């Protein structure tokens, strides 16, 4: 399985802390640290008796990726020598949540844990990708099916905090989507911009938008849906049967429209949206909210890559302030 390229959309940050992580038994860290926990898992729980080949997989700039070939099949392994296990544990929980919807294909996570010499790893299903970009209509349909199937009674958020690219993503549960998106998504990114760049202008205007954005959600029924969270072209692939595969998630439960927030970096076409909305019908005011969900990702790019993305974020904020007369 090829790891997603992060060349345009994300770069690395050194540290992430997740709150109250309690991993599920499917991929819990081993109680006793072995010299090589990856090899140990593959040769025990992975049911292999020998590892025949280990090859590197290119494309990522945050983690190292490897293809482990064994007599019990293949495994895809990511490692990071500078970040603790919380990042990969969050990814594993997201992959598992998507996998359990039995809708769109995702790599099945097997194990995430700590490396004895520092850093962390995740072992997952190896998927052999095809060369085609595949059927966008099928991608749209299956994404909608995942949104429809992935429900929770806990509200908006996720079991743990995770990462968007390499930026911490706060997922504390909330019963109010407008509050959650304003505080945990836009507000958090605006604070990063102020703290990192001293950008009080975008911070103040952004908070004015947050305080006045409620009318954009009038007459909208918002149910928490399981979102991929970082759906751009580098995190979308197709298997040998030309079935869509989504990977490297930043999962949480939110408004389904928020999963289109990276559409400017995903190449979604008309067939994608037509197929999606046949399963998850478009709601009133969708077009007015579209840029609000782009804004989160433009702000994240600003925080990760610098001023090249500031103008796009500020333009969206200014347009909404005019629209809302705020």
Curated annotation (Swiss-Prot):
GO molecular function ontology, one term from the record: protein-ribulosamine 3-kinase activity
Keyword S-adenosyl-L-methionine set for record: no
Domain of life per record: Eukaryota
Keyword RNA-binding in record: no
Keywords: ATP-binding, Chloroplast, Kinase, Nucleotide-binding, Plastid, Transferase, Transit peptide
Listed EC numbers: 2.7.1.172
Gene Ontology CC entries for this record: chloroplast; mitochondrion
Location within or outside the cell: Plastid, Chloroplast
Residues annotated to bind ATP: 125-127
Catalytic activity: N(6)-D-ribulosyl-L-lysyl-[protein] + ATP = N(6)-(3-O-phospho-D-ribulosyl)-L-lysyl-[protein] + ADP + H(+); N(6)-(D-erythrulosyl)-L-lysyl-[protein] + ATP = N(6)-(3-O-phospho-D-erythrulosyl)-L-lysyl-[protein] + ADP + H(+)
Main location (coarse class): plastid
Active site (record annotation): 230
InterPro entries according to UniProt: Fructo-/Ketosamine-3-kinase, Kinase-like_dom_sf
PANTHER family recorded: FRUCTOSAMINE 3 KINASE-RELATED PROTEIN, PROTEIN-RIBULOSAMINE 3-KINASE
Family named by the database record: Belongs to the fructosamine kinase family.
Function of the protein: Initiates a process leading to the deglycation of proteins. Phosphorylates low-molecular-mass and protein-bound erythrulosamines and ribulosamines, but not fructosamines or psicosamines, on the third carbon of the sugar moiety. Protein-bound erythrulosamine 3-phosphates and ribulosamine 3-phosphates are unstable and decompose under physiological conditions.
Stated name of the protein: Protein-ribulosamine 3-kinase, chloroplastic
Species of provenance: Arabidopsis thaliana
């Amino acid at each position: 399985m090829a790891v997603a390229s992060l060349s345009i959309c994300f770069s690395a940050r050194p540290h992430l802390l997740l709150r109250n992580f309690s991993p599920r038994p499917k991929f819990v860290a081993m109680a006793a640290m072995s010299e090589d926990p990856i090899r140990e898992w593959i040769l025990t729980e992975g049911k292999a008796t020998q590892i025949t080949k280990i090859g590197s997989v290119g494309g990522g700039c945050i983690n190292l990726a490897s293809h482990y070939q064994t007599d019990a099949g293949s495994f895809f392994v990511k490692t990071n020598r500078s970040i603790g296990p919380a990042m990969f544990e969050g990814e594993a929980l997201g992959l598992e949540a998507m996998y359990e919807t039995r809708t769109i294909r995702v790599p099945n996570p097997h194990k995430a844990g700590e490396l004895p010499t520092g850093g962390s790893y995740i072992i997952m299903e190896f998927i052999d990708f095809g060369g085609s970009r595949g059927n966008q209509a099928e991608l749209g349909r299956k994404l909608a099916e995942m949104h429809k199937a992935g429900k929770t009674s806990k509200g908006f958020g996720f079991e743990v905090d995770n990462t968007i690219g390499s930026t911490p993503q706060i997922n504390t549960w909330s019963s109010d989507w407008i509050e959650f998106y304003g505080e945990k998504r836009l507000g958090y990114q605006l604070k990063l911009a102020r703290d990192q760049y001293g950008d009080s202008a975008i911070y103040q205007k952004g908070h004015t938008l947050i305080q006045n954005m409620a009318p954009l959600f009038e007459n909208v029924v918002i149910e928490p849906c399981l979102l991929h969270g970082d759906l751009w072209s580098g995190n979308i692939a197709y298997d040998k049967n030309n079935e869509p595969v989504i990977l490297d998630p930043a999962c949480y439960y939110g408004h389904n429209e928020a999963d289109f927030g990276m559409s400017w970096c995903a190449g979604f076409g008309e067939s994608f949206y037509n197929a999606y909305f046949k399963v998850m019908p478009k709601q009133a005011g969708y077009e007015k909210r579209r840029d609000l969900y782009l804004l989160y990702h433009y702000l994240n790019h600003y925080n990760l890559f610098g001023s090249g993305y500031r103008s796009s974020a500020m333009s969206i904020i200014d347009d909404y302030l005019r629209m809302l007369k705020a």
